Amino acid sequence: MDGIHLLGEWYGCTGDMPEMTHADTLRALCVRLAAESGMTIVGERFHQFTPAGVTGTVLLAESHLAIHTWPEHGFVTVDVYVCNYTTDNSAKAERLFRSMEKALQPQHVRFQAIHRGGRDA
């Protein structure tokens, strides 16, 4: 199915910010920004690591947002994948990705956009 997969590696995030260290805070941020981006949330799951760090996924009708934090390294990986089955959701994906980036304030960003599938595939 045609879609876009946005992948980020974010370096130099502030390791002690609550979004990096607490599952509930990161969950609230992800859910809020997904909704504000126009996505349809169908579920979510976040896990708190000890002593810190979070992994989480927001399931979207359009596909998903996944995020993993390593506060001890100031490092985050994030991916936003959307399918474009009946509607082009690419702008929503970009808006969500950039909103997450703005919230976590990385000093250095590695970014990839992968076009997935295709109607002619």
Regions inferred by a protein language model and the residue ranges of each:
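Polybasic/polar functional segments that serve as interface/processing modules
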Residues: 1-121
